[in-house]
Amino acid sequence: MSSICPTCTKRVYAAEAVKACEKQYHKLCLQCFHCHKILQLGQYSERDGQPYCKTDYDRLFRQAGYRGGGVVADSFEPAPKVETTTPVEPTPPPTFLTPTEEVKVQLFPTNCPKCGKKAYFNELKVYNSRDWHKTCFACFSCNKNLVSGQYSEKEGLIYCPRCYQSKFGPSGYTNTGALVLH
């Protein structure tokens, strides 16, 4: 018996099914509920019946006090890897039915994480499996445009080397790499 994929609302047959959050998905439809990154079995966490990647789960649901070294009760724990061994059903012959409703499915979301608008191919920069506008791919702190390989990420936000070092690096560090003592 096939079920309906919650992402694309099409039938899921045993040969193409993965089970997550008590639901049957197509392998490519098991995606983070927030950023739509494709997830692997055991590499996601569940919240309110929806799968999330580690980055989004931590950013959206971790409790205050995380940076202070306190214990976080609501932290990311990968969901257990579940393999299903349901018998393979023969694929039914194709039928040609008239759809009763129009279903719009966006399999490859291209919304920029910074501005939320659609990023088209000619203005696109891909970083961490997300599509950014080239103009939006800038330091979160000083808004300086970033060059490939010359940036750092912290909690899903991108920074130029100088801002990252000043915010998250050890105190007393200078751009020369030497510790200044007076």
Curated annotation (Swiss-Prot):
Q: Residues in domain LIM zinc-binding?
A: 3-63, 110-170
Say which species the protein is native to: Dictyostelium discoideum (Social amoeba)
The disulfide bonds in this chain are none
Which example biological process does GO assign this protein?
A: response to osmotic stress
Describe the disruption phenotype.
Cells exhibit normal growth, but display altered morphology and F-actin distribution. They show changes in chemotactic motility associated with increased pseudopod formation, are significantly impaired in growth under stress conditions and highly sensitive to osmotic shock.
Q: Which gene encodes it?
A: limC
Concerning PANTHER family, the annotation shows: CYSTEINE-RICH PROTEIN CRIP FAMILY MEMBER, LIM DOMAIN-CONTAINING PROTEIN C
Tell me the InterPro entries matching this sequence: Znf_LIM (IPR001781)
A UniProt-annotated Pfam family: LIM
Does this entry carry the keyword Metal-binding? yes
The name on file for this protein is LIM domain-containing protein C
Which cellular component appears as one GO term in the record? filamentous actin
Describe the function of this protein: Binds to F-actin and may modulate the chemotactic response during early development and contribute to the maintenance of the strength of the actin cytoskeleton.
Where is this protein found?
Answer: Cell projection, Pseudopodium; Cytoplasm, Cell cortex; Cytoplasm, Cytoskeleton
Give GO MF terms, alphabetically.
actin filament binding; metal ion binding
Q: Which PROSITE patterns match?
A: LIM_DOMAIN_1 (PS00478), LIM_DOMAIN_2 (PS50023)
User: Which keywords are on file for this protein?
Assistant: Actin-binding, Cell projection, Chemotaxis, Cytoplasm, Cytoskeleton, LIM domain, Metal-binding, Repeat, Zinc
Q: What is the lineage of its organism?
A: Eukaryota, Amoebozoa, Evosea, Eumycetozoa, Dictyostelia
Q: Which domain of life is it from?
A: Eukaryota
User: Chief subcellular site?
Assistant: other
